[in-house]
Amino acid sequence: MEKGEINFFSENDFVLNREQDYRNWIEKAIESENKYIGDISFIFCDDEYLHKINLEYLAHDTYTDIISFDNTLGNTLQGDIYISTERVQENANSFNTEFDEELKRVLIHGILHFCGFKDKTEREQELMRRKEEEKIALFHVEQ
């Protein structure tokens, strides 16, 4: 099976530093769930851009940090993940954490949804948090 690509796009002025490190980490996280890498796009945007998508496609009149459109086929993960960098920054401030740490959590949250993990019930949320922590621990940057 041909391996897909993980790509990063920006609809605002956000620039993801160390793109290849993030790509390698996401690939490692996907493989750790015994899944395959299809074409996955992360699209960074602002609150208004994501709010418009939330209204148009999900009929939700709320701001959110992430919306994922899952096109996974079998065990091959693919789809589009929209992330509001404004909301990530606000969450980082609220949770007293660094922007990069909160961004990792949101990035991997979308991937975990593609892997089949849900977060509607309290039990599902607890498992999602554990999985997020497990995958964040896989992120290593060589200095």
UniProtKB/Swiss-Prot annotation:
Chief subcellular location: cytoplasm
Positions of Zn(2+) binding: 109, 113, 119
InterPro entries for the chain: MetalPrtase_cat_dom_sf_prd, YbeY
Cofactor note: Binds 1 zinc ion.
Transmembrane segments: none
Record EC number: 3.1.-.-
Entry GO CC: cytoplasm
Compartment list: Cytoplasm
Family that this chain belongs to: Belongs to the endoribonuclease YbeY family.
Functional summary from the UniProt entry: Single strand-specific metallo-endoribonuclease involved in late-stage 70S ribosome quality control and in maturation of the 3' terminus of the 16S rRNA.
Name of protein: Endoribonuclease YbeY
Species per Swiss-Prot/TrEMBL record: Christiangramia forsetii (strain DSM 17595 / CGMCC 1.15422 / KT0803)
